[in-house]
Amino acid sequence: MNAPDKTGTDRRAVPAAVDLDALIRAEHRDPFSILGPHDDGKGGQYVRAYLPAALSVRLLARDDGRELAELHMSDVPGFFVGHLEQPQPYLLKINWAGGEQITEDPYSYGPLLGEMDLYLFAEGNHRDLSSCLGAQVTSVDGVEGVRFAVWAPNARRVSVVGSFNGWDGRRHPMRLRHPTGVWEIFVPRLQPGEVYKYEILGAHGILPLKSDPMALATTLPPDTASKISAPLKFEWHDQDWLQSRAGRHDVAAPLSIYELHAGSWQMEQNDEGQWRQYNWRELADRLIPYVKELGFTHIELMPIMEHPFGGSWGYQLLAQFAPTARYGSPEDFAAFVDACHQAEIGVILDWVPAHFPTDTHGLAQFDGTALYEYADPKEGFHQDWDTLIYNLGRTEVHGFMLASALHWLKHYHIDGLRVDAVASMLYRDYSRKAGEWVPNRFGGRENLEAIDFLRHLNDVVALEAPGTMVIAEESTAWPGVSESTQKGGLGFNYKWNMGWMHDSLQYMEEDPINREHHHGKLSFSLVYAWSERFVLPISHDEVVHGKHSLIDKMPGDRWQKFANLRAYLAFMWTHPGKKLLFMGCEFGQWREWNHDEQLDWYLMQYAEHVGVKKLVGDLNRIYREEKALHQRDADPTGFQWLIGDDKSNSVFAYLRWSNDGEPLLVVANMTPVPREGYRVGVPLQGAWTELLNSDAETYAGSNIGNGGEVISEDEPVHGMSASLTLNLPPLAVLIFKPKKG
């Protein structure tokens, strides 16, 4: 016969000393084997609970609340044991010093995650991971609560902690699901809005509290806790947009992107002179009419995933599934996207699968080992940014990032992702000297795991989120970035044309008197313009860190700077390739961009700045309306040089062709010297309408031009049967279209 202990409890009800000692020290790997209900071998159950600081615990019937039994405190303070004559659902009635609590027992529930979920996660191919891991508001056996699940295969113990348990890691140690390394627990009666973290015991002791890698919401930085969030419940009104999206994203369609930083586009100043960032709904009210007025087809948001340091602009993020709390709730962000779609504006997100910051509350050494990153710093540490590199060769990390992409595209109706820093992913020796990198298994410099990930990403996105886009920021000559994976490419829809950007800006920065010596910098991009499907990017990177604003890059006096800027934008909009322009460039902001301050909207009281903005609006309108400027972007037959070698005058002339054979003529004069009587060949006789003159008075130019129309002459030149005699304004671009009828 088993004698009772001094509390009157059958000693069989108390775990072995070694188990109890491990539980008390918060080191037990399987708390469910000790806590909760366990058969007594006679048809009844022992019930055990470890509730440090509890004064007393009783069991109540779940159905009617009657008292079933008292749990007696054992020799170990906080460890309570009791007995039920027969198994039945019960509640814990806990008496604390601060009051009474009635709740279900977290340790009365069996395994929660399905075997298929765990299998797909381990395989790296769970397409809806954000509805599986993390904090999931759910119901188990009719009880509302939150299921927590986190991947930490090398941890000795994982607990979920928060204000609901006094941030005490002894209260809710989790169950390890072998062999995937996922830990789980259901905490009854928890509500959305509660904050939490994970307390992880690694091989060498307790780690700093960790935020949830799968968090759907977060607290406002500098706080670093995760926040329980119910599944996104938002009534979308964008079905018309979603149905038309694939056509809008076709390579033959116009694509004009306004890049912005949500927090610094525009702010509100209070009576004390303090600046406040707008939330998503306020931003939508102000931004959408502005973007519509300018005629952009899409906006591109710099990363809006939660990030600890605002000065990283979002590129050093730690919550791949949670919109930052800086601008509101997940529902607020969904409302912003929905409002954009109803206004026929697409939304592209910058997305960062290349690296993550070293903050101790984040992914670094998540379970005490290099889990998300490479263990070897020669593979896993990015020297340029002092960040860690995702180990995309690990199936779980591969699947984690894949699920992040799908989360934004499917749950938030995002129209495209711009993948940041692709070049750093493709090469193991990126920005590294000899001896500072590890070759791949074939001895080469290519990062085979990242290449496999990018190809898989693009294939899966095409399948799971048809009609969306994935755009690469890739700065090297890697072949086939926008070629299909079936043909050996990486499978992106578009690639940023960094070569065009660097060469064209270097040309524009030259004093016009020297441009004849750099003529090829403006024309060389047409040698490779069809090697990829390109976006022409004038992004945030070009207006920070001492590079000067776009207008301040331009040479000359004030008038020439504005004229150069207008000419450059007109050249960009008529050059093959989709368009991207960073906020502030559309009206010629003088200052470099500062993420802590709003744009210099006061400049809109000056005619020159208004003129640049009006030009951008007209360029976008003409770009959308004139098929020749977008239909054959990816086809070399859509572009034809007329004059590419007039170095002495710095004049360029070319035709753009539509699918039905309609041409547009573009003539650029990149010097401040007007050219009168300048002859340019054209393929059609008759009248040619001057669609745009970047020197027009309406843009605050000098208004030198051709009176809106020019009649061709029967004088062949430049391989054409007819020609136009033009007045070329200084530092200006002209666009002509043959007049019908």
From Swiss-Prot:
It comes from the Bacteria. GO terms for cellular component: cytosol. Coiled coil: none annotated. Pfam families: Alpha-amylase, Alpha-amylase_C, CBM_48, GlgB_N. Pathway: Glycan biosynthesis; glycogen biosynthesis. Its EC number is 2.4.1.18. GO terms for biological process: glycogen biosynthetic process. It catalyses: Transfers a segment of a (1->4)-alpha-D-glucan chain to a primary hydroxy group in a similar glucan chain. The keyword ATP-binding does not apply. InterPro entries: A-amylase/branching_C, Branching_enzy, GlgB, GlgB_N, GlgB_N_E_set_prok, Glyco_hydro_13_cat_dom, Glyco_hydro_13_N, Glyco_hydro_b. The active site is at D420, E473. The keyword Glycosyltransferase applies. Keywords: Carbohydrate metabolism, Glycogen biosynthesis, Glycogen metabolism, Glycosyltransferase, Transferase. Gene3D superfamilies: Glycosidases, Golgi alpha-mannosidase II, Immunoglobulins. GO terms for molecular function: 1,4-alpha-glucan branching enzyme activity; cation binding; hydrolase activity, hydrolyzing O-glycosyl compounds. Catalyzes the formation of the alpha-1,6-glucosidic linkages in glycogen by scission of a 1,4-alpha-linked oligosaccharide from growing alpha-1,4-glucan chains and the subsequent attachment of the oligosaccharide to the alpha-1,6 position. Monomer. Belongs to the glycosyl hydrolase 13 family. GlgB subfamily. This is 1,4-alpha-glucan branching enzyme GlgB. It comes from Pseudomonas syringae pv. tomato (strain ATCC BAA-871 / DC3000). The lineage of its organism: Bacteria, Pseudomonadati, Pseudomonadota, Gammaproteobacteria, Pseudomonadales. The gene is glgB.
